[in-house]
Regions:
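Active-site glycine-centered loops adjacent to acidic/histidine catalytic or metal-binding residues
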Residues: 47, 144, 167, 189, ...
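Adenylate-forming
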Residues: 26-30, 98-103, 140-141, 149-153, ...
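Conserved AMP-binding A3 loop
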Residues: 1-27
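Conserved S/T- and glycine-rich ATP-binding loop of Class I adenylate-forming
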Residues: 6-9, 42, 89, 155, ...
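Conserved ATP/PPi-binding loop(s) of AMP-dependent carboxylate-activating enzymes
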Residues: 187-194, 203-231, 251, 266-270
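Conserved AMP-binding/adenylation subdomain of ANL enzymes
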Residues: 24-41, 48-128, 136, 161
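AMP-binding/adenylate-forming catalytic core of the ANL superfamily
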Residues: 214, 219-220, 243-311
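Active-site loops of AMP-binding adenylate-forming
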Residues: 20, 147, 153-161, 168-186, ...
């Protein structure tokens, strides 16, 4: 069992009390959902105090009888991948986006790569790229924040599927993961099969607060019954604070944080995270935050953005 502290992005850090049963139920459901194998070699890049890394990158491969490999440092990732030949790599969006940007930069500089692609031999270029990752990498799992769809599609073209999942520390942490067979870019897959879920107060687009209940939900916050009562209701549902919607195949799309929701003067719900993802694609933007603001006595909010330019 563990007490893992949340990042504190929504308030003061709180210790989520997670039992052995929480972790093992999450591991078992994740294996069924994604389709991991005993022959898989997981490359561990993220720190183990991160619940995503601890469960999916450490406990999961050990429970399978698979292999768990560790990089020496961020600077030696490429070299270590060639040596360790992983089949699975778990990462956060920033790392995946930097790796893909570096691939793109190297391809632009390489005359051989440009010539091969011009000759219709892009598959050969992609095979050489995969060889740099050890030649056995069959999927990259992403969690922690939204990922640029261009990065997801770019890795797919290379022949390395990137599966974007969703979770939070309070759920040990996985809530929804895609499968290789049915992944839809822009979604985080389906809710794990041992969790019950509901969308609270959905709007006209179907987006509502995601609430989940099941064996991987924490006992509560350590020595903080008040904070526990704020997120776990009388029926045992954990209120995630995240807005989500479902498609016809039950794939989940995360729209943003409930507290960040902007309601404009026409009463329309606007999800700032979706706008931020579009603005961040501009090469001249280093960082951006989209927020709502009011002018005078207006009802509703206008939408604004604070942008940090890329030097």
């Amino acid at each position: 069992a563990s007490i893992l502290y949340t990042s504190g992005t929504t308030g003061k850090p709180k210790g989520a009390m997670l039992t052995h049963g929480n972790f093992t139920s999450n591991v078992e459901a994740s294996i069924r959902q994604v389709g991991f194998h005993p022959s898989d070699n997981f490359l561990n890049i993220l720190p183990l105090f991160h619940s995503f890394s601890f469960t999916a990158n450490f406990m999961l491969p050990l429970s399978l009888g698979g292999c768990c490999s560790f990089v020496r440092s961020i600077k030696t990732i490429t070299e270590d991948m060639r040596l360790l030949q992983p089949t699975v790599m778990l990462a956060v969006p920033l790392l995946a986006e930097k790796i893909y940007a570096r691939i793109q930069e190297q391809m632009k500089k390489s005359m051989a790569a440009r010539a091969l692609r011009a000759a219709g031999l892009g598959a050969l270029v992609h095979r050489r790229i995969r060889a740099r990752f050890g030649g056995r990498l069959r999927l990259i799992g992403i969690g922690g924040a939204p990922t640029d769809p261009a990065t997801l599609r770019g890795f797919q073209r290379i022949g390395i599927p990137v599966l974007e999942g969703y979770g939070l520390t309070e759920c040990s942490p996985g809530v929804a993961y895609p499968s290789l067979a049915s992944y839809v870019v822009g979604t985080v897959g389906q809710v794990l099969d041992n969790l019950e879920y509901k969308l609270l107060e959905p709007d006209a687009t179907g987006a509502g607060e995601l609430c989940v209940r099941g064996p991987s939900v924490m006992l509560g916050y350590y020595k903080n019954p008040g904070a526990t009562a704020e997120v776990i209701d009388a029926d045992g549902y954990l209120h995630t604070g995240d807005l989500a919607r479902l498609d016809d195949r039950k794939n989940l799309t995360i729209c943003g944080r409930r507290k960040a929701l902007i309601v404009n003067r026409e009463g329309k719900n606007i999800y700032p995270e979706e706008i931020e993802q579009v603005i961040e694609r501009c090469p001249f933007v280093k960082d951006v935050i989209v927020l709502g603001y009011q002018v005078g006595g207006e009802t509703g909010e206008r939408v604004g953005a604070i942008i940090v330019p890329d030097d």
